[in-house]
Amino acid sequence: MEFSVKSGNPEKQRSACIVVGVFEPRRLSGVAEQLDKVSDGYLSNLLRRGDLEGKSGQVLLLHHVPNILAERVLLVGCGKERELDERQYRQIIARTMNTLNETGSMEAVCFLSELHVKGRDTYWKVRQAVESARATLYNFNELKSKKEEPRRPLRKLVFNVPSRKELALGEQAVQHALAVATGMDICRNVANMPPNICTPRYLADQAKLMADNYDNLTVATVEEAEMEKLGMNAYLAVGRGSEHESVLTLMHYKGAADDQAPIVLVGKGLTFDSGGISIKPSANMDEMKYDMGGAAGVLGAMQALAELQLPINVIGTVAGCENMPDGKAYRPGDILTTMSGQTVEVLNTDAEGRLVLCDTLTYIERFEPESVIDLATLTGACVIALGSHASAVLSQHNPLAHEILNAAQQSGDKAWRMPLWDEYQSMLDSPFADMANIGGREAGTITAACFLSRYTKKYNWAHMDIAGTAWQGGKDKGSTGRPVPLLTQFLINRCNTEAAE
């Protein structure tokens, strides 16, 4: 599928189909009015007749419109003009994409990128349009014996920009969008794999396959034997009950000078989380294959980064592990000595992600990072607090937190900051160890971040809890590809800031 931008008049487009908007109630958009004028009122007559109201998501396909060079004109309902927001814009693009494939058109020119979305420029509208269009094409059927490919004749989609001056901006938007979309596909493919295939070793292998395509991306692994020497006892304890060995995968992307301190992305990679001895209820336990959503997000972000060849140093860290009950599994009541030397009393083996992450966060101190962001499907409490719309951001470093929130706002990959105040730290007190691995029923997302904060004193750090956003359940069960758009935007912004300085 090819995406591009151009600037031109709608009536002069020699295309299989051109796409224009209609607002509610029965009001042509500016571009549609141009077509109406050239076609001697053909479109406005249709609207007066009641063929299309203009409600969001309505479509009307027209053939042989008078004086128009295109074979077809697709009218797309956009709702009330003043109420057109970002979410509705993306939904309109997705509806358009599905309709175009139903029409049989092999190529089309879309003028919906000229719609007014409050506070958004041409770059944003083109980028979101391409990302939304690509998302409609995603289909995970690798493991089906009979692969029924959906009918998708559309091969080329061109988005029109208002003026030739904005072509460069539009082209950059397409480039960024395609990199993000490819990263999201990687994230979704890995996360959707079943846990009998997607093991900690599989995550490492996927990183190595990615590195084969880029000269400035290299991969190393930390195996269990080395973890033992390093004293990563918390990480090792979580994986002891599994047949599959734990693997910490390090992806080194070199886009800048060696002396530039790297940004480190850390992804929780629990390829299956049964809960261990504190076993989870059976209902929806199959979805615990998505407990490696943070690791999948890191893989996706590294793919987008490498595709864009951004001038920045980044280390993607994939903390692969599996939490299973077994005679060798760790138990409630165990006290673990972490790599940092701090001790942890295990009160619940289902609070395992923080144990894997705490040793990983200590390990990466050796890279002297400029900033660290960890991503984890860490707490059910986050889903209760924020639902499935926003990822949680927790940090004691305000500038980094603000950067992440800005990237969320720009990319449309929403996030919300939660407090990380010292008052919550005492909830982790243990009579037998330096801390417990859970803090009780209240403020679960915050106390989990408090736990991690004790291992991040040597660098600027932020934690993202993506438990509600990494995947969706139900009939449309599957990975969402988040937070790849947010992370990619964060890295783009970092490069832009450094270039400006």
Curated annotation (Swiss-Prot):
It holds the Pfam family Peptidase_M17_N. It comes from the Bacteria. It is found in: Cytoplasm. Keywords: Aminopeptidase, Cytoplasm, Hydrolase, Manganese, Metal-binding, Protease. Mn(2+) 1 binds at D273, D350, E352. It catalyses: Release of an N-terminal amino acid, Xaa-|-Yaa-, in which Xaa is preferably Leu, but may be other amino acids including Pro although not Arg or Lys, and Yaa may be Pro. Amino acid amides and methyl esters are also readily hydrolyzed, but rates on arylamides are exceedingly low; Release of an N-terminal amino acid, preferentially leucine, but not glutamic or aspartic acids. The keyword Transcription regulation does not apply. Mn(2+) 2 binds at K268, D273, D291, E352. The active site is at K280, R354. GO terms for molecular function: manganese ion binding; metalloaminopeptidase activity. Belongs to the peptidase M17 family. NCBIfam families: PRK00913.1-1 (NF002072), PRK00913.1-2 (NF002073), PRK00913.1-4 (NF002074). This is Probable cytosol aminopeptidase.
